[in-house]
Amino acid sequence: MACHSALAAVPSSRLHFYAPRPPLSTSVCPFQTALLGQPLRIYSSGASIAAAASPRSMVVVAATKKAVAVLKGTSQVDGVVTLVQEDDGPTTVNVRITGLTPGLHGFHLHEYGDTTNGCISTGSHFNPNKLTHGAPMDVVRHAGDLGNIVANVDGLAEATIVDDQIPLSGSNSVVGRAFVVHELEDDLGKGGHELSLTTGNAGGRLACGVVGLTPV
């Protein structure tokens, strides 16, 4: 009997799929299934079907997360910050801010995404480990210490920062917190000023923006 005829002759209520090898006493005929792409055998004695599907390799795809912050302030300073993180790797931050005075400006991630009182209500630097202020490459630093960005003669600052302390998920996620660009250069905790180990003595807050997730 043809294989498709054999299958049709078996009541659907008696069809069973199983993995073990068939008994030697059963008669078999090959049947190709498009579902598995593997040969099936149909067993007339037990009206059962055994599939010998080979193991399939599993491909793990990295989970990409993206976020954005739009910076606004009372001055003419504004900008956009985008963040991308692949799986649990470091976060890549792309910064573009206009309206700055030429030179260095402190750039930090602050604890709160609260801008009800302008940039003042964003709180202190994001500091889950309760450390003192430092440079981005220092072991002792705030997680939100991202150093300085440099504005050109036209007041434009563009930078790419890669950092492993500002993830987009988990207990220390930066989503809902705020980026702030400052008036002055950040002394990276080494200026000897009374504010060096807290703010880097970076001066006033020119513009800020809350981090929010975006479609990938």
Curated annotation (Swiss-Prot):
Disulfide bridge positions per record: C119-C208
Cofactor(s), by name: Cu cation; Zn(2+)
Domain of life (superkingdom): Eukaryota
Binding site for Cu cation: H108, H110, H125, H182
Keyword annotations of the record: Antioxidant, Chloroplast, Copper, Disulfide bond, Metal-binding, Oxidoreductase, Plastid, Transit peptide, Zinc
Top EC class, one word: oxidoreductase
Molecular function (Gene Ontology), one example: copper ion binding
InterPro entries with a match to the protein in the record: SOD-like_Cu/Zn_dom_sf (IPR036423), SOD_Cu/Zn_/chaperone (IPR024134), SOD_Cu/Zn_BS (IPR018152), SOD_Cu_Zn_dom (IPR001424)
Name recorded for this polypeptide: Superoxide dismutase [Cu-Zn], chloroplastic
Originating organism: Zantedeschia aethiopica (White calla lily)
